[in-house]
UniProtKB/Swiss-Prot annotation:
It comes from Legionella pneumophila (strain Paris). NAD(+) binds at residues 75-80, 109-113, 133-134, 146, 155, 173-176. It catalyses: 7-phospho-2-dehydro-3-deoxy-D-arabino-heptonate = 3-dehydroquinate + phosphate. The gene is aroB. This is 3-dehydroquinate synthase. Its EC number is 4.2.3.4. It is found in: Cytoplasm.
Amino acid sequence: MAKFELYAEVDVSISGHQYPIIICRNGLIDPDLINRFITSKQVLIVTNRTVAPLYLGHLQSVLPSKQCDVVILEDGEEHKNQRSLFTIYDSLIQNKHHRDTSIIALGGGVIGDMAGFAASTYQRGVRFIQLPTTLLAQVDASVGGKTAINHPAGKNMIGSFYQPQAVIIDLNTLKTLPEREFRAGIAEMIKYALLVGGSFFERIQEVLQQGLTVHSPELPLLIAECCQVKAKIVEQDERESGLRALLNLGHTFAHALETYTDYKKWLHGEAVAIGLYCAAVLSEKKGLLDKPIVDQVEKMLIHAGLPHKIPNSIDLIQLRELMSLDKKIKNNCLRFVMIKKPGACYIDDSVTEDCLHNTLINVVEGEQK
């Protein structure tokens, strides 16, 4: 059996609940590691049709003494809905899972969101372990305890805050990740670079210029740093009453774009990439961000192989209406994360309709800034 290899461990402490984020190789097939967090006799593994053929058997093999049930869902954001959620509930109930059961999320952000929400609500809460298999889930979605399903009216409209027992990031799972999915995860890394600034921003710029791949030696520690950044923010503000809202940089635009296209045109990270560029242009329009930094953001997204412009087929008026459904609205004001410079971001609820519309026009494909 391949030997367990530890790169880093990030400790998270939220509201008295402590858990580790373990960045490693061969963690998925290490019985000591998995059973350290699965103390229950019953386990439900939630995964999807893409991941199951690759890793489900490996995970089941380290849980031979457990009642190990499995739910295999359709893959994709468009399936993060009530029907999929009730498929999880149905399996838990039909297989007589008790309150001391454990749910394992084996997959990307969609699986983590749904399995986590099921764990937070089944019998008022059961143990939950994240095994993220995409870069986006490893650096962002699996960290911080946000769980949700989508509603036809908007993304993540129904959800909860619920922390896992552990997050086990086995980097070997990235070897089978499609190139497009890997690049989508880089968008969240660029987001962290903009939030943190300083040497981290410069380092992300540098590795993107060189060409970041799944084989890049810098990748394990970059993932660990992203997890550390998010963990520190979430520890201070679990329920997004202030500081944590900064993690939504670019997401007001991104969620509206995803809803507009019924989650079928872009991966979440690709929509975030466009949202980051929109946020940079909006910050420039407000006189906050220097044009050279906007150009740097654009180059980072291009180096990452990510989209950054809004297709000219999108109805901008309808897009703005979808933004008005955003969960981040407070006192009827749409709130955007603005960038003064990398490492200096803040929440702004004074963006006018004209300023927002001018920003959207400027980021449409074929338009000049």
